Amino acid sequence: MFKKILIANRGEIAVRIIRACREMDIMSVAICSEADKDALHAQLADQTVCIGPAPAKDSYLDMERVLGAAMAVGADAIHPGFGFLSENSKFVRMCEKCNITFIGPSAEIIDRMGNKSAARKTMMDAGVPVVPGTKDAVYEAEEGQKIADDMGYPVMIKASAGGGGKGMRVCYNSEDFVHTFETAKLEAENAFGDGTMYIEKYIEDPRHIEFQILADKYGNTIHLGERDCSIQRRHQKLIEESPSPAISDEQLSLIHI
């Protein structure tokens, strides 16, 4: 059992982790930027460490500052929440070198599945159906434009390290592609510290239904059922509905197998 956990996040997810720590009699340490000193998560935690200025790249995304804070307070584990450093394999390896447990997947799994472009490639190699699009990462707008022209518009430009609707843009024609790509890339760099992109065929009026799998390091694995996340704003989920009204019992039985 951990004695002290540093929470490398902010907002609602940090508050939830703090509550879980309290229920388990584990000391919680919040980190905050200079702009978040009075935020709820900073007030609720047993300890709070300010790790830098307001921009995320200088605070929540600064791996050395986050890890330095954990070492300074004597935390034996770091919980990343979601977003920020939660799918950064380099950060996981840094934690391992400092003998601090990263609460989440191993660096090897994140390398394969944490990066969405790499995850697409892994699934394609395994024969799993995916939305038509690129198999490899796209680094330059001109390269992506040629791919999109061949694929046909509209296309969705996505950040490989993306999440929470960040770094996603729909492009409807070749003339707008370079500007749209660069806008999405800049947003991804600011949000995740990674401007690598990939491209998919844009699907209009889709249903977004997820099946979440949870496993521990001992090999115990469960699924948590389906969640319909189709109601979104700016590509970010607003409501998660379970069970989904859009999938039949027959389809569910096939997927659960």
State what each model feature region is.
Residues 1-254:
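N-terminal beta-alpha lobe that positions the nucleotide/phosphoryl donor
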